[in-house]
Amino acid sequence: MANDKINIHGARVHNLKNIDVMIPRDQMVIITGLSGSGKSSLAFDTIYAEGQRRYVESLSAYARQFLGQMDKPDVDSIDGLSPSISIDQKTTSKNPRSTVGTVTEINDYLRLLYARVGHPICPNDHIEITSQSVEQMVDKVIDLPERTKIQILAPIIVKKKGQHKKVFEMIQREGYVRLRIDGTIYDISEVPELEKNKKHDIEIVIDRIVVKDGIRSRLFDSFEAALRLANGYALVDIIDGTEMLFSEHYACPYCGFTIGELEPRLFSFNAPFGACPDCDGLGVKLEVDKEAVIPYPEKTLREGVLVPWNPISSQYYPEMLEQAAACFSIDMDTPFEKLPKEQQELLLYGSNGKLFHFHYENDFGGVRDTDVPFEGILKNIDRRYHETNSDFTRDQMRLYMTELPCQSCCGYCLNPQALCVQINDKNIGQVNELPIKEELKFFEDLILSEQEEIIARPILKEIQDRLIFLKNVGLDYLTLSRAAGTLSGGEAQRIRLATQIGSNLSGVLYILDEPSIGLHQRDNDRLIASLKKMRDLGNTLIIVEHDEDTMRASDYLIDVGPGAGKQGGEIIAVGTPEEVAKNPASLTGQYLSGKKAIPVPKERRKGNGKQIKLTGAAENNLKNITVTFPLGELIAVTGVSGSGKSTLVNQIVKKALAQKLNRNSNKPGKHKSISGYQSIEKIIDIDQRPIGRTPRSNPATYTSVFDDIRDLFAQTNEAKVRGYKKGRFSFNIKGGRCEACRGDGIIKIEMHFLPDVYVPCEICHGKRYNSETLEVRYKGMNISDVLNMTVNDAVEFFKSIPKIYRKLQTIVDVGLGYITLGQSATTLSGGEAQRMKLASELYKISNGKNFYILDEPTTGLHTDDIARLLKVLERLVDKGNTVLVIEHNLDVIKSADYVIDLGPEGGEEGGTIVAKGTPEEVANVGESYTGRYLKKYLD
């Protein structure tokens, strides 16, 4: 067996058609093809699954039952496999404790660095807290110039009020004759009476010594006596010189602030030892949001201004409010904003113990009749959220709460002891908040002592290597404290790449899923260089990718096709990018060679003359910008990664419009105002989330075409004779479905330490319905046959039924004709799910006043798919609607009517509008990175 290639024989996973393919090892290999052609089936479900399965199979049967073992892929043989690591976009942790720092393991090295070379600084007195052994204290004194006169003092009172008579008695009992009070030396018999209300310092004079040979033993005794009397502190007063304060434990001698021994766990917000006790290491606390509770202060109490207390199923709170208002003389018909301030405060925070009489009788005859204080709506929501055992109630209360930075730790997640430790005047929380490019500079400029340099060198190398990689893949705008759950799929994948680069493994098979997603063309070169570095370490990279630059940079290209679904699953072309470009059978090759291309529109739409205007957008890194969105156009929001695109569109525009149009309680990002929304009726977010959460959901049920098909079957003569209604043809309810598998068509068999096996139901043979239901036919086909049809076949089959035909034709129009009507929604890719949502919008009757938002709709799409997607978006705009896309793909940007380019950089250096206008106008703005790359596409 050759060691320089991976040989796959007879792969039949999903739509793969018994293919044989050779993949060269230690090279960067791209697998490309149309969406749904079988790329992921080959890369992830065949190659990765078999590599992972073989590893797990090498473990004991006991260990295997705890691991999620993968099914053996349907393939005859795979030779030359290495241990495989999959880096996709679906496995990002949503745990709030998972951050960029923890995922990349930079946090582990940072914690070690602070534990080894950090300096504890008292937060109150701003002096360094040090700890020395008696031997170190003695050495410090011995190192002083010979004949230096010193006195060793025990500081027993530090800045405390009082006359301290008992302290003087104790000193006398201990046999000491001299002490220093507020800087003046006194004999114990001559101590003055101290002012009671003044703060005093009192130190016992333990010994007076001249530095010379032979005093080490005497110094030891004196220091031990001072430490015993002053609870671990000793003060050396150099006569006519300075003072040296010593401590045998980490504690401030002035305020008593203590810190334990520095160890890495002190700097972990995921460990009780280091986490902030107030927020449990999360950095945020849930607080009731007054604006969510009272979104419309112009309303009155009677009109329901206090939203959480509006009657849904009970009159309890409305009646309580009315009776309290009567008692406290609050007018129910005055707008909340015009009520006196003290009445507003009472409604929000309660009556401060003042009672009112409350009488309430529920629907079951229960009566409450008592004098109670009025709780106030904000306190009521907070109490109910924390006290309830009901998930429903907690979820309801959560709607009116917001996360605010914890005031105790300032959002740094750590306790005061961890945050007092500094390196170059910054604590670990402050370092975690720096953008990665600034953090790199911080570590490059680090000033350490010679000994600290030796300790820190290997730790700093690990930190800097990972930070440099994050910078190289275009993520230098992120901070290490950024929650992993807030990252896009592309960002998360590139962060996991950073971890792998840091591990410096070789001989590994890496399988990646579109690492270029979410990356601006400017940053693509750096990503490609990083991928090549992984290859040069002796690894094999198999990348599912559509990006032209990445394909051209690859060593080997595999084009899967020719179509999607049943029309795909074959190897169309293999070889270098140049060889594939010359292959006339390869659709990818035609785009690489320039024979096919997405044309530049001949003219740009002018819109309907109306616009939505957003003023003062200042969320995250947005710099108080004002943006206009012309209606009736295809608008592209562009910019480098981290420039503020998602903040502008998803956090402000989408939420602000939803709040105005739908009275949505989701609070939009920081902005002054939004106007012009009266010109639209609906805001529709078409994202890549699954169209259904269960395997029972499918394209037929999602588009509601299955309702029409069931109506059609219920109208057949056979159904009428048998008395079958529409419900008989549903696989979700009893009656027509097979009860052995409950309409699933398959049965799960648990295998414990082997993966679960799914087998066709023995009763219905995978058809989902009982035999009586399957006897009803339309044009010779039963309901199960229809669900197994591809959409392309179904369009032809139902072409005489306009209602069904129109819905199915829109699915074909978005390029999904290859999927089956009954295909489980959970098997659709993100791009397929998004296009299915677009299809459902296309067949709806539109009044041309919809505002569609799409976030990177080209994710997972081949250039040919993008051409089809653009036609769909243009159909929506041609109906008078507005389509707003966040996009990096230059084919989409050049096809837009209006472009808003944010930047110029990511993070704090972004957040401004660099260019706006038609693609041609943006291309002429020299400061715009998007414009520079766009120019080539417009020529």
Task: Give names to the regions the model predicted.
Residues M1-D939:
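Conserved phosphate-binding elements of NTP-dependent enzyme cores
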